[in-house]
Swiss-Prot record:
Substrate for phosphorylation by PKA and PKC. Reversible phosphorylation appears to modulate contraction. Thick filament-associated protein located in the crossbridge region of vertebrate striated muscle A bands. In vitro it binds MHC, F-actin and native thin filaments, and modifies the activity of actin-activated myosin ATPase. It may modulate muscle contraction or may play a more structural role. May be involved in the early phase of myofibrillogenesis. Coiled coil: none annotated. GO terms for cellular component: M band; myosin filament. The gene is MYBPC3. The modification Phosphothreonine is found at T274. This is Myosin-binding protein C, cardiac-type. The modification Phosphoserine is found at S265, S300, S1169. Expressed specifically in cardiac muscle among adult tissues, but is also expressed transiently in the skeletal muscle at early developmental stages. Isoform Type I is found in embryonic skeletal muscle and isoform Type II is found in both embryonic skeletal and cardiac muscle. SUPFAM superfamilies: Fibronectin type III, Immunoglobulin. The lineage of its organism: Eukaryota, Metazoa, Chordata, Craniata, Vertebrata. Residues 102-117 have a biased composition (Low complexity).
Length: 1272
């Protein structure tokens, strides 16, 4: 008995066990866990149990209990207790309370098994206290072990039969399970199979269920007790216990119809003996059943049988035809025995004709099909055709009439057609439907097929910071569908901490992580029964980047000062400090936070606002500082007629550079003095010193401009617009709103009055974020990685590029995911952790001190794929003088790129140059390399190719010499050809014999030493086998065939025997040897043509001259003489005999020429005056035992024939040892033919076997030798 598979370590130190309680009582299950504080769940039939009046759940420390109150039959299911990953299943069995008055059986005869009883008539009601079979509860399906149905306890009366059935699920089993039946603890019942015990098994291919049965025949009191059924597979084991109760047969004074059956046997002195029961265990019953008494009293027997069944005399007789019609064929003989049927074969023939006459429907012209199938959500029409167009039709669902309700069901009547339309089919519509017209019904079954759940909107990759909320969202094709979430291949469940939350909203499915951690990074998968979607989650530590810092400002009184900075996280808040103290906003001081930009605005600047200002992001160790300087303009007293002067640090000798960020406002205040008030002119000068713009309509050189400008010349800049000049008495203001790159350059300011002029050059530099780089290029694509390359942007924004930021997204997604937080300094990056087979795109950002550029165009879509692994099992299959045959198996890992083919190369020994062996790629896993040079030593290798490139090479380690290998010829004879091949006339013979040998051997066939005729027998040869083909076998094809292989001087020969058989001819010389009383003795001789096969027996039939209907008297009868008894007085009978061999019965029969007349009884019989002849004789073997040589492992029989009066007792010996108690041997005796069957003999079973026959007149014995050969 195989040991059960070892289980993983359980969280339970004490497990609940299967318990049996009485109905109405209380059941308690207890469990103990290894640790305290573990949450324990209880389940009933897969559904979690909650605390209620019915179920009480308690937990104290590590002890847990489940109490079920008022146990009923509905509670007899499978329960389970779960702690962590451990799950223990157990059962609750409910037994009915014992009854005070047991129901006595109705019949005195032994009660057969419930499965063997024929269906009784509808009106019978033998025992009102026993519920009918239809109301019995169904056997519970076993969800724990291997059993689908366990054997149940049984009860039988002495002499009755009972069958125990066990069903095992075979869907997950690779081969048939092993089943053993035991009585008590250790008694294996396989060794007890015989007259009273039979074991059966079968396999249902449709339901994939193995059925094993143990049948107990003619039970006696010693059979009662406990039994066990054990089933085991390679890695699983289960067992089930059941009990058998055997009741004594009740005493009844009524007539037992079986007492009318008598077996007649010959006793010494020629007297005929009748006995109700002559057989004993181990011996065959002798004589023949006498049904003559029943012929005259059939009606009385039927009434007696009815009384035996507990019926009243007023009830009608049993309809034996109805019982036979409903009963299975295996019950026919039992019914015939029970109800006194004498001509069972005749009744069965008539019953067969009755069954063929199917009753035609009068109400329906066309019925419903047996079954229909429809997809969920679709509609279906069920249609019938009725004979009467005015007939009323009812439609039933699961036995309940369907009522009109909305648009769900539509009833239509079109002529003779009646149509039921079911709209929007759901799983609730999967049921049995009936159409009822008057008293006739038409049945069908509707199966609603649920389509697979598809993922219509897949998951998207996400990148978050530690502590942020993560929400994965996908959309499926069905509302409320069940999906499974996994992280890195491990299923996610609702934990006690509720780390993961699952949410459904219509067709949308959500996975929510409230507070993400670094450990949450990974690949998340959502699975349905029709699709899979994968997304990646990257959780980064919080890191703040400053895209734009605050700058120092110099402003005048009553001007506006604006400090602005930009950080990477728009959710980060911060505070502003002035000389270390927090700035409090008021009407003049404003603080704003819009997105990633933080601003501090000071209106109407005063000298008190001059200070150091700082911005501190909340939660980060950053301090952004800048200084605000207050410019106080002091104008000294200038006498009248003073030349103009520009009060700047730069007086035109060296350019002063003013830097402004693109998009910001540039305000340049230039203090001036002079009397009279000078005229201000602004000009923009290019790098060569030429005037870009001028104040007059004519072009002026710088020298001309400086000397010839007048006060009434046209000004370059307007007082309104994006670029403008504001004039004041003591200063002028140059303003650029939203500085742009084109505003960069040298600006010249000229002040002039009649007294003189002054000028100054101011350099304005506009800095900006870089231009977006060009689209990145993808290279070096692997299984989950790739290399990204890009070029610097064409314009860096006037500031050096600090680094780059890379983003990635799936082709079908809209969400870009950032791959790096630290700026990339290099122009290449290796992206990892991608999913093979998914299409991605990349884009790049350039970052300088001002900020981040716009994204680059997306790269070309690409798919991470990897080359396959190298092919496996690369070997040389065959070598010839110019060819080498190679074979291999596909790579273990192919990947999402598939497999385009293989490339095969070879290299000469000592060389490093590999030469392609085949033109292009081959898709096969074998190759024949041709046109090689004989004698070369070559290395071979093979590579697998797909979109990603070549795999590693599988190389043959040793060089292969191109030269034919001589191999001795050897014929491999199939097992079924090692013994005589028997075929019937007309069948096709196709014999294939494989062989080995190189070079290709010469093949020759012979029959009985003569060459085969090619016109009659076909021969086809190949390099590995030879085939003998006969399209239509005839008797002359029988014989010994020899096939010979020859390679030079080496040969191998095998002989095959073919036997063609045909039906035998009829027996010869049949005659009536004697007619006496109600008996006729027949004799005949064997047929002249035995059909080339041994005659197995004869079939004897009789026919009354009046009806000439033939009835079989004997089947498989071996002797050439017989006595037909129990003939009817006054009738004339003809007799015929068929011969039988392996092909079947002969086409014609030998028939007696003259009828045998059974004379009527006359005067009283006067015994003869002479002494009666003594018919007794000592045993004598009429057919000897034959020496045999058999193959081990196949059942073998030894047969002989004996005669003797009285019937001798038979003993079998092996090497003088009695075999009576050995279960390996089975002994049979039928009509004088003795057979010893040896089950699967081994070489140890060889030896001398002796058969000994003993009776009161003497004894005889015969011996043979048995050799057991081991198959080669």
């Amino acid at each position: 008995m195989p040991e059960p598979a070892k289980k993983a370590v359980s969280a339970f130190t004490k497990k609940p066990k299967t318990t049996e309680v009485a109905a109405g009582s209380t059941a308690v299950f207890e469990a103990e866990t290894e640790k305290t504080g573990i949450k324990v769940k209880w389940q009933r039939a897969g559904t979690e149990i909650t605390d209620s009046e019915k179920y009480a759940i308690k937990a104290e420390g590590n002890k847990h209990s489940l109490t079920i109150s008022n146990v009923g039959k509905d509670d007899e299911v499978t329960y389970a207790v779960i702690a962590g990953t451990s799950k223990v299943k157990f059962e609750l069995k409910v037994k009915e309370p014992e009854k005070s008055e047991p129901v006595a059986p109705a019949e005195a005869s032994p009660a057969p098994a419930a499965s063997e009883l024929p269906a009784p008539p509808v009106e019978s009601n033998q025992n009102p206290e026993v519920p009918p079979a239809e109301t019995q509860p169904e056997e519970p399906v076993d969800p724990i072990g291997l059993f689908v149905t366990r054997p149940q306890d049984g009860e039988v009366t002495v002499g009755g039969n009972i069958t125990f059935t066990a069903k095992v699920a075979g869907e997950s089993l690779l081969k048939k399970p092993s089943v053993k039946w035991f009585k008590g603890k250790w008694m294996d019942l396989a060794s007890k199979v015989g007259k009273h015990l039979q074991l059966h098994d079968n396999y249902d291919r449709n339901n994939k269920v193995y059925t094993f049965e143990m049948e107990i025949i003619e039970a006696n009191m010693t059979f009662a007790g406990g039994y066990r059924c054990e089933v085991s597979t390679k890695d699983k084991f289960d067992s089930s216990n059941f009990n058998l109760i055997v009741n004594e047969a009740p005493v009844s004074g009524e007539m037992d119809i079986r007492a009318a059956f008598r077996r007649t046997s010959l006793a010494g002195g020629g007297r005929r003996m009748t006995s109700a029961f002559l057989s004993t265990e181990g011996l065959e019953e002798s004589g023949e059943l006498n049904f003559s008494a029943l012929l005259k009293k059939r009606d009385s027997f039927l009434r007696t049988a009815n009384r035996g069944d507990g019926k009243s005399d007023s009830q009608p007789d049993v309809d034996v035809w109805e019982i036979l019609r409903k009963a299975p064929p295996s019950e026919y003989e039992k019914i015939a025995f029970q109800y006194g049927i004498t001509d069972l074969r005749g009744m069965l023939k008539r019953l067969k004709r009755i069954k063929k006459e199917e009753k035609k429907s009068t109400a329906f012209l066309k019925k419903l099909d047996p079954a229909y199938q429809v997809d969920k959500g679709q509609k279906i029409k069920l249609m019938v055709e009725v004979a009467n167009p005015d007939a009323d039709v009812k439609w039933l669902k699961n036995g309940q009439e369907i009522q009109v309700s909305g648009s769900k069901y539509i009833f239509e009547a079109i002529g003779n057609k009646r149509i039921l339309t079911i709209n929007h089919c759901s799983l609730a519509d999967d049921a049995a439907y009936e159409c009822v017209v008057a008293e006739e019904k038409s049945f069908t079954e509707l199966f609603v097929k649920e389509p697979p759940i598809l993922i219509t909107h897949p998951l998207e990759d996400q990148m978050v910071m530690v502590g942020e909320r993560v929400e994965f969202e996908c959309e499926v094709s069905e509302e409320g569908a069940t999906v499974k979430w996994e992280k890195d291949g491990v299923e996610l469940t609702r934990e006690e901490t509720f780390k993961y939350r699952f949410k459904k909203d219509g067709k949308k499915q959500y996975l929510i992580i409230n507070e993400s951690t670094k450990e949450d990074s990974g690949h998340y998968t959502v699975k349905t029964n029709g699709g899979v979607s994968v997304a990646e989650l990257i959780v980064q530590e919080k890191k703040l980047e400053v895209y734009q810092s605050i700058a120092d400002l110099t402003v005048k009184a009553r001007d506006q000062a604006v400090f602005k900075c930009e950080v990477s996280d728009e959710n980060v808040k911060g505070i502003w400090l002035k000389n270390g103290k927090e700035v409090v906003p008021d009407e003049r001081i404003k603080i704003s936070h819009i997105g990633r930009i933080h601003k501090l605005t000071i209106e109407d600047v005063t000298p008190g606002d001059e200070a150091d200002y700082s911005f501190i992001p909340q939660g980060f160790a950053y301090n952004l500082s800048a200084k605000l300087q207050f410019l106080e303009v002091k104008i000294d007293f200038v006498p009248r007629e003073e030349p103009p002067k520009i009060h700047l640090d730069c007086l035109g000798q060296s350019p002063d550079t003013i830097v402004v960020v693109a998009g910001n406002k540039l305000r340049l205040d230039v203090p001036i003095s002079g009397d009279p008030t000078p005229t201000v002119i602004w000009q923009k000068v290019n790098k060569k010193g030429e005037l870009v713009h001028q104040s007059n309509e004519d072009s002026l050189t710088p020298s001309e401009n400086s000397s010839d400008l007048s006060t009434d010349s046209k000004l370059l800049f307007e007082s309104e617009g994006r670029v403008r000049v504001e004039k004041h008495e003591d200063h002028c203001v140059f303003i650029i709103e939203g500085a742009e790159k084109e505003d960069e350059g040298v600006y010249r300011v000229i002040v002039k009055n009649p007294v003189g002029e002054d000028k100054a050059d101011i350099t304005v530099k506009v800095i900006d974020v870089p231009d977006p780089p060009e689209a990145p290029k993808i290279s070096n694509i692997g299984e989950d990685y790739c290399t990204v390359q890009w070029q610097p942007p064409t314009y860096d924004g006037g500031q050096p590029v600090l680094g780059y930021i890379l983003e990635r997204k799936k082709k079908k997604s809209y969400r870009w995911m950032r791959l790096n937080f630290d700026l990339l300094k290099e122009l290449t990056y290796e992206a990892k952790r991608m999913i093979e087979g998914v299409v991605y795109e990349m884009r790049i950002y350039a970052v300088n001190s001002i900020g981040m550029s716009r994204p680059s165009p997306a790269s070309q879509p690409f798919m991470p794929i990897a080359p396959p692994s190298e092919p496996t099992h690369f070997t040389v299959e065959d070598v010839s003088d110019t060819t080498v045959a190679l074979k291999w198996r596909p790579p273990e890992r192919i990947g999402a790129g598939g497999l385009d083919g293989y490339i095969v190369e070879y290299c000469k020994d000592g060389s490093a140059e590999w030469t392609p062996a085949l033109p292009g790629l081959t898709e096969r896993t074998s190759a024949l390399i041709k046109d090689l040079v004989t004698g070369d030593k070559l290395y071979f290798r093979v590579k697998a190719i797909n979109l990603a490139g070549e795999s590693g090479a599988a190389i043959i380690k040793e060089p292969v010499t191109v030269q034919e290998i001589m191999q001795r010829p050897k014929i491999c004879v199939p097992r079924h050809l090692r013994q005589t091949l028997v075929k019937k006339v007309g069948e096709t013979i196709n014999i294939m014999i494989p062989f080995q040998g190189k070079p290709r051997p010469k093949i020759s066939w012979m029959k009985d030493g003569q060459t085969l005729d090619s016109k009659d027998v076909g021969i086809r040869n190949s390099s590995t086998d030879t085939i003998l083909f006969i399209r239509k076998a005839e008797l002359h094809h029988s014989g010994a065939y020899e096939v010979t292989l020859q390679i030079e001087n080496m040969t191998d020969t095998v002989a095959i025997t073919i036997q063609i058989i045909d039906k035998p001819g009829p027996p010869q010389n049949i005659k009536l040897a004697d007619v006496w009383g109600f008996n006729v003795a027949l004799e005949w001789t064997p047929p002249q043509d035995d059909g080339n096969a041994q005659i197995l027996g004869y079939t004897v039939q009789k026919a009354d001259k009046k009806t000439m209907e033939w009835y079989t008297v004997y089947d498989h009868y071996r002797r050439t003489n017989c006595v037909v008894s129990d003939l009817i007085m006054g009738n004339e009978y003809f007799f015929r005999v068929f011969s039988e061999n392996l092909c079947g019965l002969s086409e014609t029969a030998a028939t007696t020429k003259n009828p045998a007349y059974i004379q009527k009884t006359g005067t009283t019989y006067k015994p003869p005056s002479y002494k009666e002849h003594d018919f007794s004789e000592p045993p004598k073997f009429t057919h000897p035992l034959v020496n045999r040589s058999v193959i081990a492992g196949y059942n073998t029989t030894l047969s002989c024939a004996v005669r003797g009066i009285p019937k001798p007792k038979i003993f079998w010996y092996k090497n003088k040892v009695d075999l009576s108690g050995d279960a390996k041997y089975r002994m049979f005796s039928k009509q004088g033919v003795l057979t010893l069957e040896i089950r699967k003999p081994t070489p140890l079973d060889g030896g001398f076997y002796t058969c000994k026959a003993v009776n009161e007149r003497g004894e005889a014995e015969i011996e043979c030798r048995l050799d057991v050969r081991v198959p080669q």
